[in-house]
Amino acid sequence: MKQRSICPGRLSTAIAVALCCFPPFSSGQESPGTIYQFNDGFIVGSREKVDPSRFSTSAISEGVYSLDVYTNGEWKGRYDLKITAGKDGKMGVCYTKAMLMQYGISPEKLNPQLSEKEGFCGRLQEWRHEDNVKDTLIQSSLRLDIAVPQIYEDQRLKNFVSPQFWDKGVAALNLGWMANAWNSHISSANGSDNSSAYLGVNAGLSWDGWLLKHIGNLNWQQQQGKAHWNSNQTYLQRPIPQINSIVSGGQIFTNGEFFDTIGLRGVNLATDDNMFPDGMRSYAPEIRDVAQSNALATVRQGSNIIYQTTVPPGPFTLQDVYPSGYGSDLEVSVKEGDGSVEVFSVPYASVAQLLRPGMTRYALSAGKVDDSSLRNKPMLYQGTWQHGLNNLFTGYTGVTGFDDYQAFLLGTGMNTGIGALSFDVTHTRLKSDTLDEHGQSYRATFNRMFTETQTSIVLAAYRYSTKGYYNLNDALYAVDQEKNYNSNYTVWRQKNGMTFTVNQNLPDGWGGFYLCGRVADYWNRSGTEKQYQFSYNNMYGRLSWSVDAQRVYTPDSSGHRRDDRVSLNFSYPLWFGENRTANLTSNTAFNNSRFASSQIGVNGSLDSENNLNYGVSTTTATGRQHDVALNGSYRTPWTTLNGSYSQGEGYRQSGVGASGTLIAHQHGVVFSPETGPTMALIEAKDAAGVMLPGSPGTRIDSNGYAILPYLRPYRINSVEIDPKGSNDDVAFGSTVAQVVPWEGSVVKVSFDTTLQNNITLRARQANGLPLPFAATIFGPSGKEIGVVGQGSMMFISDASAPKATVKWSGGQCSVELSQEKTKETLCR
């Protein structure tokens, strides 16, 4: 653990020397009251001037101690452990089989016979007679270190902490927000002004493990003349660690792993994979495209806007988009400064789902359909269940439906030598006033990582065998159309569909490529939709370059309309002195084999913490159109500000934005430029200016608080503060802490601080001899306030004390501290 001395300056050196005299105690080597004899001949100088007696006696004794337990360096929690003396008089920890399992150790592997005992007190080596099996008690930090070979660890519990150490957090409001304002002016014969504003809110009120969550946005369009609030989700949730599940009620979404993701006003109970040891994690797609100017990128899932941001000219990648569920494609729109809009979809399908043997995953949902585009909103139910049968097979099943529709699914996942496979069959029945259809759908998925060639393949294929098959979403729209005589939309029922993704890392120097695609046709529509995307990237020295290509086939009355887009991108790092870096970028785009645009620009940061960023670019487009674009962002201690401006022939665009987080807690309000669902509230009183290495640019505020985002729920998170920037008179008990938060919680991490008025003073005994090295200094109240260092230098942490007493074995003396501190004085 990284620590800062309680007395800054040279006092830290003295204390470091003193602390090194405290030995770690092996549980198999220490006995109570052990006397340690120090050879003071190793200390340079006169031996009678050294007093190591204070470090000569072990304070360890039999009893119960609250100790932090580490297995092979990994924290496993703080436990109350009984320490007792064995027959040989040596100290040992009392273990049980259950305790070792909590520490991530397999008792059966360590010693099958001894593991049957109720309990055992002694050295861990007595469980396994090997030199590399040992336990060491470090008394100075109340820590038990256990070291065992990896073969004796329970790998299922790697990086896992017992739920009893999960932190529910404090009562707090976590309000994340993002605001954008956008204006576009077109100066032509039919010129127009187009303005819009957007405020996105992701708020969570947490207390005692409960979380009241609201996700919504406020949209204002100049043409509409009024603002509209869109509530995407409002729900109350509670983790249930006893069954590794989470329950929620309100505006929720069904799990789209096997059926379509549907919004409900209802309740949901489902397994939370985050509560299990590290394994498969939820998947979120990357969204890639190229903007021709400062553009507004909007991501929709179904009828809901789930993400919106401003992107600068050139290639961009959105990696922080988190869809609901697993099975609904995303629609992305990119609105350029001149008013043009590009719309494309991003395939979003689950890969083959495999579970460990004996592991079960389930999801239960029920409620009223919540979809603003539907008039008919029936009550809907859904349930899915998966179970790991053995190392080869995982079985799964599911059911969903409403009054006029039912669907049943049965499938299996297989872990084979050629990759992860799954196959399932879904039978549906749709029976309403005018519809009576039934059919089947057969689905196969494949996932494989070829380690030899570093090739990753994800393939999801769907085949609808009969014309009467309706998926859940199609059925809802078909019934809504029937009951409301609404013909504004058509239900296209998919017949065959396939999506695939290939990632390939090539040998050194050859870069890598990414390929994805989607193919689909429909029973009630002629032609086939096809969409392919390819990206290749590489480096030549410091020059990064890539080629992106996209081809889209869209059925129309004449057959197929083909749209091609190709872009060539370059980036070269520049250097303008310390803390000032920049990248020279270039992008050239072609549409349908014709030149579309060429853009060149510079972007970078003006400080070492990337708080102040900028971008400048110029673009030449088809028809001799030219524009210039500027954008920048500034991360303050409270929020992140951004702005953009571009102007071209016949138009100009401007935009401003801000984002951040507000945490309201019992003792006040804290602001942060970062956002996140699970956060730490850092408390370090009188430590304004202290930095958080895990969040560049974030510092403790004047009230002694700061926010650290991006904590992993149910996992160990190390929280660190850097004393740099604090007052020299502030002493820290420690600068590193560990916490395991509940999902959506705000956990409080307090660092002990002490305000001190430190002084140094050289003093000698009345006989002229120096004070003994390492002698202890006490104040008038008897409290220890310092230590004697080399050269008879007194390091004192309380300058307000009028008098100090120096004690060592065999003597003591006193010093009046009110006299001149800069001169040598006598200790009488």
From Swiss-Prot:
Cystine bridges: C813-C827
One GO location term (cellular component): cell outer membrane
Protein name: Outer membrane usher protein MrkC
Family matches, as Pfam families: PapC_C, PapC_N, Usher
MF annotations from Gene Ontology: fimbrial usher porin activity
Protein encoded by which gene: mrkC
One BP annotation, GO: pilus assembly
Keywords: Cell outer membrane, Disulfide bond, Fimbrium biogenesis, Membrane, Signal, Transmembrane, Transmembrane beta strand, Transport
InterPro entries reported in the protein's UniProt record: Fimb_usher, Fimbrial_membr_usher_CS, FimD_plug_dom, PapC-like_C, PapC-like_C_sf, PapC_N, PapC_N_sf
Superkingdom of this protein's organism: Bacteria
Signal peptide coordinates: 1-18
